[in-house]
């Protein structure tokens, strides 16, 4: 026994709880119903901690065949579905195997004297049922490998052929004398069928037996036997396992309830097959050892539970409650309870005591230091569920092993210590009872104490009771979070509520002696023992046990030469599992190439499943954009490869680009990149609104979780995403300078217009009387100053005015070129004209314009054209302009045209900036245009500026054909049209 790889170590234990229930502690539902035919009639239920390097100290031990290690098993190990062998002894066994796995299976307890011979894996229905299928076993075969994958579905042994296996060397089965429970006519050269094979995966949930695919050429199917028909008629039903999490169930109803929340999409196909197999099994009372298998349960299923209590609804009273402390009246009981909690928080804030900084605001526990309190809040009172938190106590533990030890020492299966005293609703979680009270007993007289769950119906006693809990003489329950005012209340609570209230559903129908393994989580242990290849849920190896009953021990424990080095290798490569304090193992497991291939294959299978599901996804044609990364989705399978958890924070996503952006933004070394992604998509994100189409609920980007919660609560509601473009205004230096120029430009604009308009009136007289060269020279000298002044006015308003404004300035400057040097001096004298005189002058102008309209038919045609356009952008064809120019005989028009084509004109540069150049109008065109506008709008125009300009222009109009006057009038009329 020195070379035994399964030799127990003192400190190597897995993070599974192995608890032997004593006889006096057994609940009524745990007691035995019938005696087992064995030497020891003491077979309790085991809820146990399995050691990875030592056998379970129990009455049930599994046998392992030394010659048939399977290297091709994935996702767990064989369950009890094939066969089981139990040995009622507590001694340790050695393994003289010829080909052991590198990392020894945890639950294997092989027999030291097992024969190196051929095996038959075959189900059976009765003890002593012997078949002849061992005759087809070839003695020359070396080893059989079974690849049990999850893709093949459930166990099909009840209707399928029997699998045969051949050992390493040629030998036969030599059985011991069977016990009294055996049939007497046992052929010693034929193998005795056993009942189950223990799993090799202690931390991963054991799957049910799948239909094996033969991976070796030496695998042979036993044909010509009648075991299939007998098995389907008289066999015991095999334990079923959940196809997703592989938790075993002996009955169909608990499996249904489990699959409803675990994998509802697979329940129809699974239960359809399960019903067919269960209906074919009639004899369920056969007392055989296959009933004593291994059941794996989680802590949540074994220890926690809920009970609805009295379903009858309580009558609503709508009672008001008055707080005698602040004399405030609350409308219902829930608001009064919240008010009292608010009072308590205010009193704690006002009294700066050390207890306020060390008391948890959630469970009201006191801690030595504020740092420990903060650690407690972050690890326990978190929205994320961790496998190291006890929901009953609301405490977090270092490892899963410590949690399981705590559950064993302090809690019972199906314990529900938190009770609603109104309707007897019970739960293992305090938050469930509190939420139940606030929803079911709202608008009643009942007031719930958050410290001891006592219900009081009057406000004043409730407040006194509430304040008594703040005193130091309180009695805390050591097994939950409740605290009581008297010791008697605490003791009554412990005796009445800290015991099994409802048996877990998974334990219904289990025979006595069933070994139940409790685990804190489904997958590999994260904080407990170091994971080995046999622990991983993706791939593991398992050795099939020899077909023997529990009282048959094979002889010929001969070892082959190849078994010794393999045994040494297995012993050396077997890792030491972690100690209870969570320390890591000293040796790393050596993973064989076969196991690496299996893990790679398993991961590729999982990925292919996801990609296949997404590739087959039906979606509408068109462009699909991801809400998270705002990019186009070309391939759903590649864009959403898997569900990723950030290792630094609580960020989770399925979008690959969003995960990369998150890591670069928040967890990269260069924080400058943090804002690049924000700037790119912040404008789009700010304009997103989610609207529920069935109700009035809506939310923005910050309330996406609220919309998801709303849609999950209301299954029939649908959501619509409304996207609006929101301009993000970032003030720059250019914008600020424009804003500063905008105000003075608007003030300068009317002043410059008023200055220009009286200049036009003065220039009319100057231009009509002076035609000599001296006037032309004076006007050329004055031209530069006028252009400079007008250019300043136009440049200040250039950014705010439209293109037509620059044209107006251009025309104004062209009119200024015809004036003399005295125009600037006379501009200020005509600004303050009286409004009464202006009205009279407007009427006079109207009469003159009507007379001029009647004089020429050409002007009437032109006025009809202007009426059609009625805007400052009216233009004339070159032919009409040519005809109009020929009809005019005024010399000033030639000067006007000559000045317009001069390259030195500054105003021409200003007009070029507007990219639109208007042709100059003749005097007749201007007069007709002005008359038309006055007739259309009447003399009562509200524009005061236009009235002033017209009055100034009509003071000194000699003949009405001055080009400078007409140009200024056109510009003013254009401005009035724009206004």
UniProtKB/Swiss-Prot annotation:
Residues 739-784, 798-809 have a biased composition (Basic and acidic residues). One of its GO terms (cellular component) is nucleus. It holds the Pfam family DUF4195. Residues 527-541 have a biased composition (Low complexity). Residues 89-119, 157-236, 523-608, 739-809, 896-979 are annotated as: Disordered. One of its GO terms (molecular function) is RNA polymerase II cis-regulatory region sequence-specific DNA binding. One of its GO terms (biological process) is regulation of DNA-templated transcription. Residues 89-101, 169-187, 195-235, 542-584, 592-608, 786-797, 905-914 have a biased composition (Polar residues). Disulfide bonds: none annotated. This is Zinc finger protein 280D. It comes from Homo sapiens. The lineage of its organism: Eukaryota, Metazoa, Chordata, Craniata, Vertebrata.
């Amino acid at each position: 026994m020195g070379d035994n790889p399964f030799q127990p170590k003192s400190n190597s234990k897995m993070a599974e709880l192995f608890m032997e229930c004593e006889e006096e502690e057994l609940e009524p539902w745990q007691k035995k119903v019938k005696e087992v035919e064995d030497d020891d009639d003491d077979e309790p239920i085991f809820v146990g901690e399995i050691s990875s390097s030592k056998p379970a100290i129990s009455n049930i031990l599994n046998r392992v065949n030394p010659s048939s290690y399977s290297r091709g098993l994935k996702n767990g190990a064989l369950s009890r579905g094939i066969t089981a062998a139990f040995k009622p002894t507590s001694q340790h066994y050695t393994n003289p195997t010829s080909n052991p796995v590198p990392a020894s299976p945890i639950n294997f307890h092989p027999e030291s004297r097992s024969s190196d011979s051929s095996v038959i894996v075959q189900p059976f229905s009765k003890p002593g049922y012997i078949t002849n299928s061992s005759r087809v076993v070839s003695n020359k075969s070396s080893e059989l490998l079974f690849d049990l994958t999850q893709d093949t579905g459930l166990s099909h042994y009840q209707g399928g052929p029997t699998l045969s296996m051949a050992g390493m060397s040629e030998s036969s089965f030599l059985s011991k004398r069977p016990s009294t429970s055996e049939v007497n006519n046992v052929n010693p050269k034929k193998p005795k069928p056993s009942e189950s094979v223990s799993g090799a995966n202690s931390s991963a949930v054991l799957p049910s037996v799948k239909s094996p695919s033969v991976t070796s050429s030496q695998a042979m199917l036993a044909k010509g036997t009648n075991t299939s028909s007998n098995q389907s008629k008289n066999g015991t039903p095999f334990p079923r396992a959940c196809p997703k999490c592989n938790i075993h169930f002996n009955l169909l109803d608990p499996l249904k309830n489990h699959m409803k929340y675990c994998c509802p999409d697979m329940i129809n196909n699974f239960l359809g097959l399960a019903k067919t197999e269960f209906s074919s099994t009639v004899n369920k009372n056969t007392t055989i050892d296959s009933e004593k298998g291994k059941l794996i349960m989680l802590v949540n299923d074994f220890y926690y539970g809920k009970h609805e209590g009295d379903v009858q609804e309580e009558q609503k009273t709508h009672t008001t409650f008055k707080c005698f402390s602040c004399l405030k009246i609350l409308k219902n009981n829930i608001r009064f309870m919240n008010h009292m909690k608010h009072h308590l928080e205010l009193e704690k804030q006002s009294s700066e005591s050390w207890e306020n900084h060390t008391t948890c605001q959630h469970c009201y526990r006191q801690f030595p230091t504020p740092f420990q309190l903060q650690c407690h809040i972050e690890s326990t009172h978190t929205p994320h569920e961790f496998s190291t938190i006890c929901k009953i106590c609301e405490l977090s533990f270092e490892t899963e092993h410590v949690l399981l030890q705590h559950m064993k020492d302090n809690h019972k299966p199906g314990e529900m210590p938190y009770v609603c005293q109104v309707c007897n609703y019970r739960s293992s979680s305090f938050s469930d009872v509190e939420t139940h009270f606030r929803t079911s007993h709202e608008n009643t007289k009942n007031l719930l104490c958050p410290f001891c769950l006592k219900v009081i119906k009057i406000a004043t006693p409730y407040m006194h009771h509430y304040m008594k809990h703040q005193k130091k003489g309180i009695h805390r329950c050591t097994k939950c979070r409740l605290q009581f005012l008297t010791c008697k209340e605490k003791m009554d609570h412990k005796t009445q509520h800290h015991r099994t209230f409802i048996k877990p559903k998974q334990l219904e129908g289990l025979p006595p002696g069933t070994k139940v393994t409790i685990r804190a989580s489904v997958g590999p242990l994260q904080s407990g023992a170091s994971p080995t290849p046999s622990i991983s849920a993706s791939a593991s190896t398992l050795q099939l046990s020899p077909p023997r009953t529990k009282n048959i021990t094979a002889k010929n424990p001969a070892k082959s030469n190849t078994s010794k080095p393999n045994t040494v290798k297995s012993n050396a490569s077997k890792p030491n599992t972690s100690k209870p304090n969570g320390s890591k193992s000293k040796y790393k497991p050596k993973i064989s190439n076969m196991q690496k291939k299996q893990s790679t294959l398993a991961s590729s299978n999982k990925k292919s499943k996801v990609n296949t599901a997404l590739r087959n996804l039906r979606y509408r044609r068109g462009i699909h954009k991801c809400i998270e990364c705002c990019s186009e989705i070309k391939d759903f399978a590649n864009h959403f490869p898997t569900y990723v958890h950030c290792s630094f924070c609580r960020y989770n996503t399925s979008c690959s680009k969003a995960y990369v952006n998150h890591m670069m933004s928040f967890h990269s070394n260069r924080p400058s990149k943090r804002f690049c992604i924000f700037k790119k998509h912040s404008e789009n994100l700010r304009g997103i609104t989610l609207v529920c189409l069935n109700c009035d609920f809506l939310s923005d980007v910050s309330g996406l979780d609220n919309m998801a919660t709303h849609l999950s609560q209301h299954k029939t509601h649908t959501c619509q995403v409304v996207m609006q473009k929101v301009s993000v205004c970032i003030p720059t230096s250019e914008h600020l300078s424009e804003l500063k120029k905008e105000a003075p430009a608007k003030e300068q604009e009317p002043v410059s217009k008023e200055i220009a308009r009286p200049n036009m009136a003065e220039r009319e007289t100057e231009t009509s009387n002076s035609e000599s060269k001296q006037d032309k020279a004076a006007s050329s000298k004055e031209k530069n100053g006028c252009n400079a002044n007008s250019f300043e006015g136009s440049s200040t308003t250039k950014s705010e005015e439209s293109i037509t404004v620059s044209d107006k300035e251009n025309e104004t400057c062209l009119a200024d070129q015809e004036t003399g040097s005295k125009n600037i001096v006379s501009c200020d004298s005509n600004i303050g004209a009286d409004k009464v005189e202006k009205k009279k002058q407007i009427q006079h102008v109207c009469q003159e314009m009507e007379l001029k309209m009647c004089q020429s038919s050409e002007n009437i045609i032109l006025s009809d054209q202007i009426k059609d356009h009625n805007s400052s952008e009216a233009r004339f064809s070159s032919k009409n302009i040519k005809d109009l120019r020929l009809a005019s005989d005024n010399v000033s028009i030639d000067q006007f045209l000559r000045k317009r084509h001069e390259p030195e004109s500054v105003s021409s540069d200003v007009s070029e900036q507007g990219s639109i150049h208007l042709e100059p109008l003749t005097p007749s065109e201007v007069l007709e245009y002005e008359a038309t506008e006055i007739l259309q709008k009447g003399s009562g125009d509200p524009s005061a500026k236009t009235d002033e300009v017209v009055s100034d222009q009509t003071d000194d109009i000699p003949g009405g054909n001055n080009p400078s006057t007409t140009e200024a009038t056109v510009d003013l009329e254009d401005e009035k049209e724009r206004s």
